């Protein structure tokens, strides 16, 4: 397994298992299979309504010798401001049937982001969240949280894949010491990413799949990756991306696929295609 180090020296597997849009009725089975295949990083959220299944999978895995402390568990709050965020997190802990999570994220800017961040800082101070961060925060919202934070965000989870590599946002995160993480790293099957001729040619050259090449590329770019699948063989396939070795030429070709624009994000987000030119100095100031 490949690891990254977050703020305060917390380590996490760089390749995790995502649960977005996994039916709550099958989440326990899927998460349990992911753990059996070898994943030790699971990502869920209040919005997904499948935290209980993730929690059940973790409890079941303990019988196989996978302790709770062996799994890097991530969830995301739903709500605006401190009170709503606190309640959302407490509900998540109950659903997950755990005393703590390894990473707690604000899922989305929903208003009073600073108040929401205060709730996360309190969760961190009480030991209920080992690390805290944000998701889908771009120029204005991210800078606002960083300016107000006593504890800066350790992670920002955003749409990121070969067609949208977040080159404008990443310097802002780097300056803040914030790790970038990719949701839907395979572009959720949109825009034909896994049939892209560049990726398929590279995959053929390495006896790999386009999905494996994509995951390996993002890991090489310093991105935490959380692909999702409900099929055990695909889970194993994604995990085997760790064994793929790309060349410098491969990576340059994949970098050239970047369009600079979202292909699957929420159109309602006011900063969906973050452009630092809209925020003078944003690219290199926190």
Model-derived features: positions:
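A short, structured active-site edge motif that brings together acidic residues
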Residues: 67-81, 102-109, 136, 160
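Short, well-ordered amphipathic alpha-helices
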Residues: 52-62, 89-93, 120-121, 142
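CE4/NodB-like, metal-dependent polysaccharide N-deacetylase domain
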Residues: 7, 85-106, 122-126, 148
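Beta/alpha (TIM)-barrel catalytic core signal, keyed to glycine-rich beta->alpha loops juxtaposed to Asp/Glu
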Residues: 3, 108-286
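Short, acidic/polar
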Residues: 22-35, 81-97, 115, 140-143, ...
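A structural motif
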Residues: 39, 98-101, 129, 153
């Amino acid at each position: 397994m490949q690891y990254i180090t977050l703020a305060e020296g917390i380590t996490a597997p760089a390749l995790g298992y995502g649960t977005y849009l996994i039916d709550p009725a099958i989440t326990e089975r899927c998460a349990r299979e992911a753990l059996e295949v070898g994943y030790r990083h699971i990502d869920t959220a209040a919005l997904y309504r499948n935290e209980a299944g993730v929690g059940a999978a973790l409890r079941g895995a303990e019988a196989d010798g996978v302790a709770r402390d062996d799994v890097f568990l991530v969830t995301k709050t739903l709500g605006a401001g401190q009170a709503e965020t606190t309640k959302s997190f407490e509900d998540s802990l109950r659903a997950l049937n755990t005393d703590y999570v390894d990473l707690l994220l604000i899922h989305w800017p929903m208003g009073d982001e600073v108040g929401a961040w205060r709730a996360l800082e309190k969760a961190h101070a009480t030991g209920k969240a080992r690390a805290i961060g944000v998701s889908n925060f771009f120029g204005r919202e991210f800078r606002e949280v960083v300016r107000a934070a006593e504890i800066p965000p350790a992670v920002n989870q955003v749409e990121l894949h070969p067609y949208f590599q977040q080159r404008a946002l990443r310097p802002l995160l780097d300056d803040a010491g914030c790790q970038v993480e990719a949701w839907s790293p395979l572009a959720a099957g949109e825009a034909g990413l896994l049939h892209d001729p560049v990726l398929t040619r590279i995959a053929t050259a390495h006896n790999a799949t386009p999905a494996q090449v994509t995951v390996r590329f993002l890991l090489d770019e310093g991105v935490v990756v959380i692909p999702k699948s409900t099929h055990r063989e695909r889970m194993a396939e994604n995990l085997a991306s760790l064994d793929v070795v790309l060349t410098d030429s491969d990576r340059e070709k994949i970098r050239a696929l970047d369009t600079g624009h979202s292909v699957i994000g929420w159109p309602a987000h006011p900063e969906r295609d973050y452009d630092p030119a809209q925020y003078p100095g944003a690219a290199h100031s926190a």
